[in-house]
Amino acid sequence: MALEAYGYDLRPEYLEALMLMGNGASIVKEDEEHPLVFFDNGMPDLSISHVLEVLGFDYEEYYLGEGQAVDLDLIRRKLKALLANGPVVLGPLDMGHLTYNPNHTHLYGVDHFVSVYDLDDDYLYLHDPAGFACMKIQFEDFLPAWQAQAIDYKRGAYSMWGNFNRVASPDASAIYLATSQIMAQRYLQGQEGVLPLYAAAVAKYGLNDEQKQLHQYFSFKLAAVRNLYLSRFLAEHDSLRSKIKEDLASLFGQAHLSCLKEDYEDLSHLLLEIAELDEQFRTLCLEARDC
């Protein structure tokens, strides 16, 4: 939404694919019986910066690093300054604090991004790509979501991106090569063996309420979409990796249904199939990096 307002015609599903957030898996909360697992191996805020750079954009960004003192007046002034040039992307936000979403109580600790288009003395005005346009929220009420205290996989709090200016126009081949390198790097830096361990835990212990809320309302359906978008992006460059991603999208869709039915035996089997395909994809990503 923000880039479109600046006059850049880039489809949301294309940008989502380039964020590369549907690969691998990460344990975000350790627990022998009920670990909390996200189906990605990257940080979403860093992914936004990567996408902008890969596509040839110059931009301004701000975030408050760990241990830095919080100065809300400074943060507000920074946002106001960026808004003078156009909409600003904010996030990661904790969806549990976005009260305009009727499902927000099921989404604490889940990251999200929005496009802010105005700020006055009391209110923030934003478009949420989850289907909530023209939302008006008191600035003070928005701060807990923006602080994202429950989201560990981020560079910092109060992150924002704005003042977008495309200074280069890399061709499709250059974009593919850059994203391919990022995929390999994330696999090398990410956690390994998460999915087989998770499959075993699900088979033995099932899912607790926290896991069910995450998976039923968010993670499986999002993983399916992310894998499908990446499959489409890869189709003209690497047919094998594209097919694996298409198959993974189908498996994540089936996992969503098994999760809703609370059929944990079937869900465990699906997670093992996902693990096998993701490992194949990982191997191909590392091989492509070395070519």
Explain the meaning of each model-derived region.
Residues 45-95, 159-174:
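Predominantly the structural core of cysteine protease catalytic domains
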Residues 121-225:
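Noncatalytic regulatory segments and standalone regulatory/sensor domains
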